[in-house]
Amino acid sequence: MSDLNLLKSWNPKLVKNRKKVWEAQQQLVEENKKIKERQKEIEKERELDRYSSLIRDEDQKNVKRKTGLEWMYDNTSTALTENVDYLLGKKEITDTLLDLSGNNNKSEKSENQKQTIRKHYQGIEDVICSKTNHKNVDLSSDDPMAKFKAAKQAHLKTLKQNIQPTSHEYPVHKPLRGANSKRYDSGNGSRSNYKNSRYNNKYYRS
């Protein structure tokens, strides 16, 4: 009987599986070669740095290989050294330098004027004002909430103006002279006086 494992796709004895294993091994070998070559290059660079650091001669300082990281270790600024040279008299101040300094000052002033604009936020109003002679720009006209508040304040002012002070004086009612009063007067005097008295008269009760 033949081996049934040869029919399986995962069988390591198959030619296609052996080919895959061989290709993976070749890739690992190539990667190891590249890693070793890179390590050798790094070692050579380190040796060159060591040799260049050992050289102290002034003529060979400029020959030092530039790595692009010199600015990280450069603490001396050229501007300060130039200013010190002018103060000590080692260098002369010419008209061209004065013209350049004047142009630089003008450019700095113009930039400062552009940057003087500042914002003030006061609730709803956002007003941009500047230190120059420009008029202040009011942006509250575009805000619906500001319009609503302004209309509300105007309405309250009109209501206060329309309200008038009222007097709390009550009207005085005078007793009417009519048929009822004559009827009580024609009878007994005591009854008419009692009915027409201040406490029992209906006109005084109101």
Curated annotation (Swiss-Prot):
Per the record, the coiled-coil ranges are 17-63
Q: Where is the composition biased (Low complexity)?
A: 186-206
UniProt key word Coiled coil: yes
- Which Pfam families does the annotation name? Cir_N, CWC25
Q: Where is this region: Disordered?
A: 165-206
The subcellular location is:
Nucleus
Q: Which family does the record assign?
A: Belongs to the CWC25 family.
Subunit relationships: Associated with the spliceosome.
Q: Which PANTHER family match?
A: CELL CYCLE CONTROL PROTEIN CWF25, PRE-MRNA-SPLICING FACTOR CWC25 HOMOLOG
Q: What is this protein called?
A: Pre-mRNA-splicing factor CWC25
What's the source species for this entry? Kluyveromyces lactis (strain ATCC 8585 / CBS 2359 / DSM 70799 / NBRC 1267 / NRRL Y-1140 / WM37) (Yeast)
